[in-house]
Amino acid sequence: MAEREVRLMKGNEAIAHAAVRAGIDGYFGYPITPQSEIIETLAQLRPWETTGMVVLQAESEVASINMLYGGGGSGKRVMTSSSSPGVALMQEGISYMAGAEIPGLIVNVQRGGPGLGTIQPSQGDYFQSTRGGGNGDYNVIVLAPNSVQEMADFVDLAMNLAFKYRNPAMILSDGVIGQMMEKVVLPPMKPRRTEEEVIKECPWASTGRTRGREPNIITSLELRPELMEVKNRALQAKYEEIRNNEVRFETLLTDDAEYVFVAFGSAARVAEKAVELAREEGIRVGLFRPITLWPFPERQLASLAQGKKGLLVVEMNAGQMVQDVRLAVEGTIPVAHFGRQGGIVPEPEEIVKALKEKLQ
């Protein structure tokens, strides 16, 4: 593989190529539409012959996430991927990883629900991802790409954040980004870490018999309530550190805007076109795109919203991120929602029409 390579490929394929180039140690997954190209591309790349990366098709999503627990617990850079109903099956394992402070990467290429739903794209997993879909008080770092390039770029970023904070991280994509094809600049190759580097960089990891160190026990269990409370408070302190340091977002034409669209992922691409159409009609509109859905850029959005006439939250769901937007602005300006469901991607003209009807 070239150090840097420009290719035309699907978002799912970009995830696979970026995983190999990011020095990932192992991928454990199970095919499900619309993300099956991730494991298919990894099988075609055969990285076990070049970098030594393990690629394993597990028997289920439940098995996949528990393999992630084991791999991450040994200090390895490991990942899995699935789509909405498959990620729902992983929630217990994600909670266990958060409780045991085990790093790992989960890629969710969303499809419509609830239940089996449809194979068409959706953003209906926002609550599940940002609120912690398993039991207990925990959070997952959530990055929302809106291009094939970001699909590739976020693999290494998410994994680095996972290890920096010893916490699961998620790339929350959708079927549009996963299946669309764009030009992408693949990142340079990063070698996998040696066993010595793993032991040095991850002193907490369970690495077997390690000279000069007591064995590490990886667990989320603590039966003494007073110690479990201490553990939970330590987790919350870590989450506050993440909130203070890892917020990411993007703005477009917001300085002179009277109204602002708030959207993430593929919906933000459509909203960007809606900004163009609205401005052609003389309506000054901008776009605020959260890149980290957790931590949500609440302070940055609240600051931007000052002096605006209203915010229109555009999503491919019944209204989920809109709750975080309303919490951020605390009733200081009107907030409306426009969403399509069932796998339908909104049209830019619909968004402009919704702005006129709901906020003007």
Placement of each model-derived feature along the sequence:
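Conformationally flexible catalytic loops at phosphate/diphosphate-handling active centers
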Residues: R166-T251
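Structural signature of the thiamine diphosphate
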Residues: V140-E197, E350-Q360
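Glycine-/acidic-rich phosphate or pyrophosphate-binding loops and their flanking alpha/beta elements
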Residues: L8-A14, Q236-Y259, E272
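Thiamine diphosphate
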Residues: E37-R131, I141-F163
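N-terminal glycine-rich anion-binding loops that anchor highly charged ligand groups
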Residues: R7-Q44
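Redox- and metal-dependent alpha/beta enzyme cores, enriched for Fe-S-associated oxidoreductases
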Residues: R248-R284, F288, W294-Q300
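Peripheral docking tails and interdomain loops at the edges
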Residues: E315-Q360
